[in-house]
């Protein structure tokens, strides 16, 4: 195989690797070639024709040329320049240059920059206005009269995000971008990811927040912009002066528009991007090709749901309860109240009478300081975080089998896999950017997707095969599939012999897991399970993703263990495109646990009960540490009721809504002697507190987050804290010092340096190594070497071998005649959990204004109810009143309740956790949220739908195609390739 090819570029020879994109090679040599439709994150689209060069004497597009032979390339001769000029002129026939008064004139308009760099002074063809008006969606708008039909938005929607809404209608007299079958944006299947606006090279697609806000001359009254455009064009007869003036205005904008790299504060994907702000106004979010987890992909929350930052609901001063009511006070008074109460409770009842709940929304540094406050200052290990509510069972299963409690590879491995198996994860709504990577792999590269879920969500609809097991029975089919693979000699014996212990004992434990047993337990036909087992065993590479549908069961740890067992038996660890991926729910739930906000583990999952570990931290902290494991979230609530816990300090967690059996939890709050809540808002939980502290959200501080793939990333402060709110780390420091300690951190980087000294997993982590879009995936060696793929050097046990873990199953979920309906629950795309942050963005609330219950058509018919009906759901622990959305996403007596009940406005009305009980996973105390039964009482039989009629879920059909279908453009009678014109 030839290693290099000779490419002669403008008379100079270069050695180039075969398969290199010609345009990328030309750019790498600092040679300018226009390329308006090309984007490095999407590849060649071939619509603009501006990148033409001469290849071996013929004018061709460089963007779609792969270097597969020696070639001579000319970018400067007259024929090339003439072809490029023709292509540029055709663009200006569709796009009016009025740069100085354009909101997009921020230094990154690719039409402006290309025309300027090329040296275009006058256009040959007159601009032709199209017979279309602007189309406004809730978050972005489309201006057909500025659209050059490059197709980037189509490529992004169809083949990057794979939402499959946007197309170009090439057949009409005046082609334009359309949504679905040519409906307005707001009536389409658009999910408002915003990537079309991200990739648009000009002002055709633009965020609504940008319009009229970006420039010095764009904040005009409606109608006056047209006059300004006319005036500008008359005053700037050639493009040279226009570019000079607009460049000066763009330079001025740098003084008013601040661009700050940050990391998304919602789910665990860890999307990074620049946030553009003007004063406190958030203009746009712009992802980058350099964004390690998401590249240029976003979802509606990360791109647009930032209303919470400037919400009038933000807390700006501390609140102290006096005579039953909250009063605003200065920080000094609030800190004194906290210090006095912590001290008196500790003196009266001992340190273990105080408990602390950390936040998966906060930074690593802040999570570290909360556990340090609990352990060093108070002397208790009663500290936990919300991984107890969701991911602790997955971590347990991985600790049992492979030794690390995190994803075994990277997000890009999910794209590389030959087969993806999704179990109990609504990925397209809970982790939409990851779902896009998998949808793309399926659509373009043939990845096979298998989905096991009780609900027919989007990934189930798209799956190559969809299986609907009975609730809580995944362990049965997972173990039966594993047994079948071994029984039929399909297991990876070489991998097992070299890398896995305890095979014989494990295989013996599978004796009862026959396919017949699995069919009876799960309801999945034996033939389907056999076919899946054979495909799984024979696939070149397999990844398994799972989430709360697995972990929030009372056998969540065992089911997670069964997943890892299957991967070990088939040899699907230690290679690209393989492994276990328990998709983390929050932006920093992985990091919060990494930082030691756990009752039995200190940073990096080091046991607090180990003498040598405690000794290391005691030397750093200067105090003796409590050797006894503390209480977890579940045990804290029990401890309050039992009189063992008298004080609770929580931050960034609405425990009174998100814990299970919240009637029981709220009753516990009422029994506390003293309660502190620290948050952006006066949350439902905060209404029970004695002191409420105003905390700053992510855009108002520096720090790091660790995402689902163990990726540690920096976020930078974009805005000053609102009012008297403070970053959590500063609040913890103030409390520690008020209690007699001498914390003196000047910046979060110093906190991370301390973490690195104490934590082998983070040993090489530093802010310098995380500069900009750089990131590290733990474990990180002292020299900064990280591990995107775990276990390449062996598994995280003393002998380097993984362990197969025997399991059993007899845990059938049965409903009785009274509580005859199974209640499933989870996220919606638009909202995050209870919605405290997302409901602060008006257009998010417009899309999904309230919580509701999904009911199957057959259950609706049985109960005589219709869309919009109001029903009361009653369980053994409580009741909730909700409106009905009838959908075939659920079947039979399965119902689904989204988590977003807007608790700050509605209290606990309609909250799913009024119905859940206190049952937990026996190994982790994770609540069994998914094992809930209820009965249904009809209040009204029909009403207004709880969903906005423009919501994409309401009878909206996708319109998939491959890319922009540029051949349709080429087939038009009015199209001639510029190179052919030059040849003529």
Curated annotation (Swiss-Prot):
Q: What family does the database annotate?
A: In the C-terminal section; belongs to the prokaryotic molybdopterin-containing oxidoreductase family.
Kindly state a single biological-process term from the GO annotations of this entry.
respiratory electron transport chain
Q: Which UniProt keywords apply?
A: 2Fe-2S, 4Fe-4S, Iron, Iron-sulfur, Metal-binding, Molybdenum, NAD, Oxidoreductase, Repeat
Q: What is its EC number?
A: 1.17.1.9
Record: residues binding [4Fe-4S] cluster 2 = 147, 150, 153, 200
Q: How is the cofactor bound?
A: Binds 1 [2Fe-2S] cluster. Binds 4 [4Fe-4S] clusters.
Q: Catalysed reaction(s)?
A: formate + NAD(+) = CO2 + NADH
List, separated by semicolons, the cofactors it needs: [2Fe-2S] cluster; [4Fe-4S] cluster; Mo-bis(molybdopterin guanine dinucleotide)
Q: Where does [4Fe-4S] cluster 1 bind?
A: 95, 99, 102, 109
Q: Where is the 4Fe-4S ferredoxin-type domain?
A: 138-165, 181-211
Source organism per entry reads: Staphylococcus aureus (strain Mu50 / ATCC 700699)
Descriptive protein name: Putative formate dehydrogenase SAV2309
Q: Where is the 4Fe-4S His(Cys)3-ligated-type domain?
A: 79-119
Origin, by domain of life?
Answer: Bacteria
Q: Which residues bind [4Fe-4S] cluster 3?
A: 157, 190, 193, 196
| Keyword hit for Repeat | yes
- UniProt keyword Cell inner membrane, yes or no: no
Which residues are recorded as binding [2Fe-2S] cluster? 37, 48, 51, 63
InterPro entries attached here? Answer: 2Fe-2S_ferredoxin-like_sf (IPR036010), 2Fe-2S_ferredoxin-type (IPR001041), 4Fe4S_Fe-S-bd (IPR017896), 4Fe4S_Fe_S_CS (IPR017900), Asp_de-COase-like_dom_sf (IPR009010), Formate_Dh-H_N (IPR041924), Formate_DH_asu (IPR006478), MoPterin_dinucl-bd_dom (IPR006657)
Which residues does the annotated region (Formate dehydrogenase) include?
Answer: 252-984
């Amino acid at each position: 195989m030839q290693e290099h090819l000779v490419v002669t570029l403008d008379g100079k020879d270069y050695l180039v690797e075969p398969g290199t994109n010609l345009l990328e090679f030309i750019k790498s040599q600092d040679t300018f070639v226009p390329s308006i439709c090309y984007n490095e994150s999407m590849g060649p689209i071939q619509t603009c024709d501006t990148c033409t060069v001469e290849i071996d004497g013929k004018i061709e597009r460089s963007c779609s040329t792969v270097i597969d032979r020696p070639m001579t390339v000319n970018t400067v001769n007259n024929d090339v320049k003439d072809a490029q000029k023709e292509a540029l002129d055709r663009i200006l026939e569709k796009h009016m240059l009025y740069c100085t008064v354009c909101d997009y004139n921020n230094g990154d308009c690719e039409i402006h920059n290309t025309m300027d760099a090329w040296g275009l002074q006058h256009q040959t063809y007159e601009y032709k206005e199209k017979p279309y008006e602007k189309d406004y969606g809730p978050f972005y708008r489309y201006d057909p009269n500025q659209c050059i039909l490059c197709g980037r938005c189509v490529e992004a929607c169809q083949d990057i995000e794979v939402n499959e809404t946007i197309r170009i209608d090439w057949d009409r007299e005046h082609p334009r971008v359309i949504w679905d079958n040519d409906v307005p944006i707001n009536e389409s299947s658009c999910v408002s990811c915003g990537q079309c606006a991200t990739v648009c090279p000009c002002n055709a697609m633009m965020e609504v927040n940008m319009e009229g806000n970006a420039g010095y001359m764009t904040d005009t009254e409606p109608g006056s912009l047209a006059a300004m455009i006319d005036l500008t064009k008359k005053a700037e007869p050639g493009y040279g002066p226009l570019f000079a003036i607009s460049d000066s205005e763009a330079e001025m904008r740098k003084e008013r528009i601040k661009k700050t790299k940050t990391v998304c504060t919602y789910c665990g994907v860890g999307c990074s991007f620049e946030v553009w702000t003007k004063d406190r106004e958030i203009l746009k979010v712009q992802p980058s090709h350099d964004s390690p987890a998401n590249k240029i992909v976003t979802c509606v929350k990360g791109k647009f749901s930032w209303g919470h930052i400037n919400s009038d609901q933000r807390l700006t001063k501390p609140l102290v309860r006096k005579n039953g009511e909250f009063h605003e006070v200065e920080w000094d008074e609030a800190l004194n109240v906290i210090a006095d109460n912590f001290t008196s409770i500790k003196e009266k009842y001992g340190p273990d009478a105080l408990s602390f709940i950390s936040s998966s929304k906060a930074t690593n540094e802040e999570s570290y300081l909360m556990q340090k406050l609990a352990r060093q200052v108070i002397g208790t290990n009663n500290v936990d975080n919300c991984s107890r509510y969701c991911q602790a069972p997955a971590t347990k299963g991985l600790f049992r089998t492979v030794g690390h409690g995190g994803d075994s590879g990277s997000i890009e491995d999910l794209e590389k896999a030959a087969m993806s198996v999704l179990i109990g994860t609504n990925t397209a709504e809970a982790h939409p950017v990851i779902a896009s990577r998998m949808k793309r792999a399926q659509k373009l590269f043939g990845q096979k997707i298998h989905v096991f879920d009780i609900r027919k969500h989007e990934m189930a609809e798209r799956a190559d095969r969809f299986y609907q097991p009975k609730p809580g029975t995944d362990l049965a089919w997972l173990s039966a599939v594993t047994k079948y693979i071994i029984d039929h000699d399909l297991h990876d014996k070489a991998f097992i012999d070299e890398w896995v212990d305890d095979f014989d004992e494990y295989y013996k434990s599978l004796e009862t897991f026959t396919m017949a047993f699995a069919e009876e337990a799960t309801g999945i036909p034996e033939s389907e399970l056999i076919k899946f087992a054979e495909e799984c065993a024979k696939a070149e590479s397999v990844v398994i993703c799972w989430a709360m549908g697995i972990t929030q069961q009372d056998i969540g740890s065992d089911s997670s263990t069964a997943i890892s067992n299957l991967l070990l038996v088939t040899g699907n660890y230690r290679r690209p495109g393989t492994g276990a991926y328990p998709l983390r729910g929050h932006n920093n739930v992985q990091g919060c646990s990494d930082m030691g906000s756990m009752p039995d583990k200190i940073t990096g999952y080091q046991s607090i009960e180990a003498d040598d570990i405690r000794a290391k931290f005691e030397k750093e902290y200067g105090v003796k540490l409590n050797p006894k494991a503390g209480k977890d979230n579940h045990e804290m609530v029990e401890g309050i009721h039992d009189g063992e816990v008298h004080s609770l300090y929580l931050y960034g967690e609405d425990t009174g809504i998100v814990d299970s059996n919240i009637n029981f939890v709220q009753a516990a709050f009422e029994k506390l002697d003293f309660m502190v809540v620290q948050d952006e808002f006066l949350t439902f939980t905060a209404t029970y507190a004695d002191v409420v502290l105003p905390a700053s959200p992510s855009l108002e501080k520096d720090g790091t987050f660790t995402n689902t793939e163990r990726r540690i990333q920096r976020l930078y402060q974009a805005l000053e804290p609102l009012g008297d709110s403070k970053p959590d780390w500063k609040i913890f420091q103030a409390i520690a010092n008020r209690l007699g300690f001498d914390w003196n951190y000047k910046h979060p980087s110093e906190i991370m340096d301390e973490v690195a000294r104490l934590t082998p997993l983070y040993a090489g982590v530093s802010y310098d190594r995380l500069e900009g879009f750089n990131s590290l995936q733990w474990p990180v060696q002292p020299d900064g070497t990280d591990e995107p793929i775990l276990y390449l050097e062996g598994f995280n046990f003393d002998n380097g071998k993984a362990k197969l873990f025997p399991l059993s199953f007899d845990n059938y979920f049965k409903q009785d005649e009274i509580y005859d309906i199974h209640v499933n629950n989870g996220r919606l795309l638009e909202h995050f959990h209870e919605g405290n942050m997302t409901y602060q963005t008006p257009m998010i609330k417009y899309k999904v204004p309230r919580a509701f219950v999904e009911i199957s058509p057959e259950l609706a018919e049985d109960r005589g109810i219709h869309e919009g009906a109001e029903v009361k759901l009653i369980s053994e622990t409580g009741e909730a009143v909700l409106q009905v959305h009838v959908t075939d996403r659920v079947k039979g007596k399965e119902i689904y309740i989204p988590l977003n009940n807007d608790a700050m406005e509605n209290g606990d009305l309609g909250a799913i956790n009024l119905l859940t009980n206190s049952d937990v996973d026996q190994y982790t105390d994770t609540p069994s949220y998914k094992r809930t039964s209820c009965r249904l009482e009809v209040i009204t039989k029909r009403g207004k739908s709880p969903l906005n009629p423009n919501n994409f879920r309401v009878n909206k059909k996708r319109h998939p195609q491959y890319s922009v279908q540029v051949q349709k453009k080429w087939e038009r009678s009015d199209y001639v390739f510029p190179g052919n014109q030059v040849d003529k």
